[in-house]
Amino acid sequence: MRRHAAFTLVELLVVIAIISVLVAMLLPAVQAAREAARRSSCQNNLKQFGLALLNHEAALGYVPPGARMKFGAAGPQIGANANVALLPYLEQAALNASWDHYRSYWEQESIVLATPVPLFTCPSNDAQTISDQAFEDVGVPAGLRLATSDYAFSRGATDAWCLSNEYPSHENGLFHIVGEGFADVTTLQQISDGTSCTFAIGEAAGGEAWTVCTLPGCTAPEGRSRADVPWMVGNLSTAEIAAAGYPFTGIYGTTIEPLNKRPVTSTLVDNAGITDCRSSVDGGTDATSNFRSDHADGGFFLHCDGAVRFIGESIEPAIYRGLSTIAGDEAAP
């Protein structure tokens, strides 16, 4: 009787072991390839931001302000941030048409506020594209859902909320608040440090992995918040929110704190001193969050010439801060 050839148990185990070794060898390469693709997509997002900024400046003669502020009977009102002004230049015509530019961001339709923009999301970040953090304890309507962004506008080497005519600062970045009593809009011609040596936008990862702590230099996470950044908010008036246990981050980043600092420093606007534009090192009471990314060892930054470069965590603090200012007169790195 003829016997059919077959695998023995030992041979089968050897084959399984070989396959397991091959999978173990290939898996890191596959994961690395996927992360490389995510990094490339994140970098391309910032390049699109760069084109939008340059086109806005070419069309209107200035860079969109970080936000606009006006004072009324109800006190200071902080408008939407620069993302809203950039929508027409980011191929977001439909979303721009849905936005009521005569109303503040909190008066917009809820469906508009909850609309995520793919360009605002870095694929390496696993945060939600819509923040479900609840601020109703401090008067923000319950159930308000805000779509998020993984990118922040550069405030410079300062954590001050604003740039007052009374407190001009060589530490200022490209984006600041515009309104009566505050500095005027910024043009590319004002960047005396050179557009290729100046940050415009950097990464601002969010999600559960990025907890938040209060005040500059903090090291212990506090409250119930994570570093989610609503893409449209100029800034919430946040002293009450922080007091209620909701330290959170905003649409601006500063180099006064280290890149990828964890926990993330909260963004804080002190209502009582909202026109006091001093940084924390000058005795001010405000705070601005640090830049951070889910890429290993650094993060991507859009420069004012439209180029996107990866900045490592090991960068010298003085060089890092100098790259974020528009007229600090620092030596080029």
Outline where the language-model segments fall.
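N-terminal single-pass transmembrane signal-anchor helix
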Residues: H4-R38, Q48
